[in-house]
Amino acid sequence: MKALLLADENTSHRFAGACRQIEAGFPIIHIADWQGGAYLSAKDPALLMALRESGMALVGFGRASIPMHAGKLTRESLGHAGVILFRRSVSAIAYGKQARLLVSFWGEAADWDWADRIEYLPRP
């Protein structure tokens, strides 16, 4: 199955692995394993545009910058393929919690239109 979600550099490989432990074949790849790690140090706009071309949503913790850049791309009619961000209440080292939140959410959200959409986990 083609990966539909990209875990950003602020997440751990353990997070992606935990998602696949909960659900075998879960469609996520860590940024270090995508495109040979070419986007590990990429600026947010470049990463969002590359993900748009690949049809992949970004998953991560970049609450300060990602929404701003995603919104700018949308306003400029360039768009993005979707963003899922963890709220401050989710610890960056709580891989199991991150995985449970994402796998549960993705069961509901996988078929949504993700173009220019930003979601936060956990949902209110």
In which residue ranges do the predicted regions lie?
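A general structural signal for short secondary-structure boundary/capping elements
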Residues: 50-55, 103-107
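Acidic, metal-binding active-site segment of PIN/NYN-like and related structure-specific nucleases
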Residues: 44, 51-52, 56-73
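Acidic, PIN/NYN-like endoribonuclease modules and their adjacent C-terminal/linker elements
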Residues: 3-35, 45, 70-124
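Residue-level preference for short coil/turn positions at secondary-structure junctions
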Residues: 1, 52-54, 79
